């Protein structure tokens, strides 16, 4: 909670190109993941950008349901998710998303039919832009320098952990965040 609280207030009023919907990883699991990343992922492996401070270590543990939403208002999303069942999540191994740019992304795989279903509902009903063809739910641990992520691939300390949530967070491109009940 300590990291999420700090990051939440630091990121208020930051403008983005798009809005998004995500679920929070609950505490104490979120704090344990942040602490693990600080202990196990070497500082020398971390990718940082002078232009975009969102890179580096992730300190707001979440699973994105959909990024790229054009609207800055949560109204449409609220209607779509209304009555959706509680979301159940199971964690998998650590994986690496490669990127043609200067970094790779160290992530924890997320297995959840509920998230897949909610992503499908949103992509079928809201205007959005995405450069990704396939939804791959995950929790980002850190952005690392190109080629440095593979040493963490397959680690399984989070594998099998589960959590549930009965809300999503609408993160508006205008910088505000709002919890939306399912």
Language-model regions, residue ranges each:
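Histidine-dependent nucleotide/RNA phosphoesterase domain, centered on the 2H-phosphoesterase fold
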Residues: 8-182
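Short linear clamp-binding motif
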Residues: 1-9
């Amino acid at each position: 909670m300590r990291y999420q609280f700090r990051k939440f207030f630091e990121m208020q009023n930051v403008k983005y190109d798009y809005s998004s919907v995500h679920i929070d990883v609950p505490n104490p699991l979120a704090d344990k993941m942040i602490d693990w990343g600080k202990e196990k992922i070497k500082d020398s492996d971390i990718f940082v950008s002078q232009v975009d401070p969102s890179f580096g270590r992730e300190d707001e543990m979440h699973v994105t349901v959909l990024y790229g939403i054009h609207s800055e208002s949560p109204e449409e999303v609220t209607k779509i998710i209304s009555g959706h069942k509680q979301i159940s999540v199971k964690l998998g191994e650590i994986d690496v998303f490669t990127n043609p740019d200067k970094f790779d992304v160290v992530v924890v795989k997320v297995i959840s039919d509920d998230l897949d279903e909610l992503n499908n509902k949103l992509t079928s009903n809201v205007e959005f832009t995405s450069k990704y063809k396939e939804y791959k739910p995950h929790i980002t641990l850190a952005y690392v320098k190109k080629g440095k992520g593979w040493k963490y691939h397959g680690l399984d300390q989070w594998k099998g952990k589960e959590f549930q949530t009965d809300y999503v967070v609408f993160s508006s491109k205008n910088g505000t965040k709002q919890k939306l009940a399912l």
